[in-house]
């Protein structure tokens, strides 16, 4: 009985955490930063990065302050983006951000300004630092021009 209850609790918590990484085709900011996570099914680093988002405590905590959208580059879908409900496809988004490989992360502040684009895998320390800067922009703590110093001060060069 305990085993069944424990398994059920783990399943529920796993399903709850998956909601952090959104596969929705309506991409909105809801007054948060936005992360577009270009992935593919055959990408081992995408799997590692998704696991980092869900299991690394510090990264998970800051990630909850963003709307994160998974965009599978091998699946052609139609997307509705932002308040203006701009219509995009997987291909048009890939072309707009020159996303030829995966993972490819594109981070926006809450005003839809592109702040960072990270091609390839970034470990939890790096990813957390990038997200902290964008969150600081959203909270008015930093100006976009301060990104180089912020990254350097936080061990990212």
Question: What residues fall within each predicted segment?
Answer:
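Short active-site neighborhood of thiol/selenol oxidoreductases, capturing the structured segment around
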Residues: 30-43
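A short, hydrophobic beta-strand/beta-hairpin element that forms part of a small beta-sheet core
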Residues: 93, 101-117
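Typically the conserved alpha-helix immediately C-terminal to a functionally engaged Cys/Sec
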Residues: 47-62
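Sec-dependent N-terminal signal peptides
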Residues: 4-13
């Amino acid at each position: 009985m305990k085993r069944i209850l424990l398994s059920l609790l783990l399943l529920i918590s796993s399903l709850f955490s998956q909601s952090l990484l959104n596969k929705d085709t309506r991409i909105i900011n809801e007054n948060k930063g936005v992360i577009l996570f270009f992935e593919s099914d055959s990408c081992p680093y995408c799997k590692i990065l998704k696991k980092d988002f869900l299991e690394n405590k510090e990264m998970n905590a800051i990630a909850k302050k963003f709307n994160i959208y998974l965009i599978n580059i091998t699946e052609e879908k139609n997307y509705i983006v932002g308040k203006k409900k701009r219509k995009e496809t997987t291909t048009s988004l890939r072309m707009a951000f020159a996303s030829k490989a995966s993972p490819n992360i594109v981070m926006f502040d809450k005003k839809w300004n592109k702040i960072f684009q990270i091609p390839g895998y970034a470990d939890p320390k790096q990813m957390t630092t990038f997200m902290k800067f964008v969150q600081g922009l959203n909270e008015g703590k930093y100006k976009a021009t301060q990104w180089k110093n912020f990254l350097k001060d936080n061990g990212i060069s």
